[in-house]
Amino acid sequence: MVQLCLLRHGESLWNKENRFTGWVDVPLTDFGREQAEKAGESIKKEGLQFQVAYTSVLNRAIETLEIVMKTIQQNIPMIKDSALNERMYGDLQGLNKEDTAKKYGNQQVHIWRRSYDIKPPNGESLEDTQKRTIPFFMNCIMTDLKEGKNVLVVAHGNSLRSIVMYLDKLSKEQVLSLELPTSLPIIYNLAPDGKVIAKKELRL
């Protein structure tokens, strides 16, 4: 059995300001750094040992991973790839979510944020995001898992939603209600062939 840990980065400045972030490279807040440290403590308490870590090329994910690695005292290879970047929100990037909902309506904004195949203006849908995350997941992360390595992945709400959708075999309708909190470690136990045996969340 091998283990895969998926972790969304800690609170970023634009999470705090309730803005659409996407590919804009904003930093963590102090609270986000605390969240990352607590996530690391949860992982350490669970006794998880990793052989490799993956993250995006955006600093909020990289810093979260660095804090977690320091907290769990594991110096492991870190692989950064834009395939794990957050979904690109197009014209919505930088806009306040509440103001956007007032302009376009709550239902429209919810569809842009949570549906599978509907894009925000000039942005990516979750389906588009999955077209880059899943090939990378299968070619790199799953390859490591099948080689017997435990893998830590620190990324973003929608890049991770696309991976959870794949692993949990969720439908387009089911993924609408999938929410991934910041800095909550999700642990998958997988068989040598990559099939999911069990899943749990590490809540402090």
Predicted regions and their residues:
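Glycine-rich phosphate-binding loop signature in dinucleotide/nucleotide-binding domains
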Residues: E46-Q49, T143-K149
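Short, well-ordered beta-to-alpha junction loops that form the rim of enzyme active sites
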Residues: T55-L58, A83, R114, K149-N150, ...
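Short, solvent-exposed aromatic-acidic interface loops
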Residues: K200-L204
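Residue-level preference for the first positions of well-ordered beta-strands
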Residues: L4, G148-V154, P185
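GST superfamily/GST-like fold recognition
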Residues: G157-S162, I197
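Extended, charge-rich low-complexity interaction segments
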Residues: Q107-G123
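Loop-to-helix element that buttresses phosphate recognition and phosphoryl-transfer chemistry
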Residues: C5, E11-E63, K103, P120-P135, ...
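Phosphate-coordination/substrate-recognition cap region in phosphate-metabolizing enzymes
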Residues: K38-H110, M165-P181, I186-N189, V196
